[in-house]
């Protein structure tokens, strides 16, 4: 797993080529939030850049995935996320799912960070099993006697 610092450094270097393009928001900086190892999945976080916000996934080296440019599904307890696979000399194999692009709706880093933190909260949330309907005693007896519930 690459370090948060290495991934941020890579995207800061990419940012030097993106600066000046209409999609580039100079009020924002590169920041990888929530970067953590996830058992059986690899590592995952939300990457903020001045031009996009992505769910950033680095699968384990042994993972069998399609080739670069194709799509793969990241399965987490909160749901399935479709990601595009990338391969880079310095970062190796990783995948991303676009959350926002361009980033002009964010006036500052704090706003982008707040959205990224909410995405992390949702992505790492356990899905809740459906709750059984509350059964009253009256409904239970009605059902037992063959009546409608």
UniProtKB/Swiss-Prot annotation:
Pfam families: NiFe-hyd_HybE (PF11939)
Source species, domain of life: Bacteria
Gene3D superfamilies: [NiFe]-hydrogenase assembly chaperone, HybE (3.30.1460.40)
Family stated for the protein in its record: Belongs to the HupJ family.
NCBIfam families listed in its UniProt record: hydrog_HybE (TIGR03993)
The protein, known as: Hydrogenase expression/formation protein HupT
Organism: Azotobacter chroococcum mcd 1
Taxon lineage: Bacteria, Pseudomonadati, Pseudomonadota, Gammaproteobacteria, Pseudomonadales
């Amino acid at each position: 797993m690459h370090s948060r610092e290495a991934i941020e450094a890579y995207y800061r270097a990419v940012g030097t080529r993106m600066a000046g393009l209409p999609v580039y928001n100079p009020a924002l900086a590169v920041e990888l939030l929530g970067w953590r190892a996830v058992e059986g999945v690899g590592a995952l976080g939300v990457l903020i850049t001045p031009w996009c916000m992505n769910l950033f996934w680095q699968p384990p080296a042994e993972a069998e995935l399609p080739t670069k440019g194709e799509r793969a599904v990241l399965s987490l307890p909160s749901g399935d996320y479709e990601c595009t696979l990338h391969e880079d000399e310095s970062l190796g194999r990783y995948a991303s799912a676009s959350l926002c692009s361009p980033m002009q709706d964010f006036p500052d880093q704090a706003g982008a960070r707040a959205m990224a933190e909410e995405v992390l909260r949702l992505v790492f949330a356990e899905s809740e099993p459906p709750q059984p309907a509350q059964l009253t005693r009256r409904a239970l007896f009605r059902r037992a006697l063959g009546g409608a519930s």
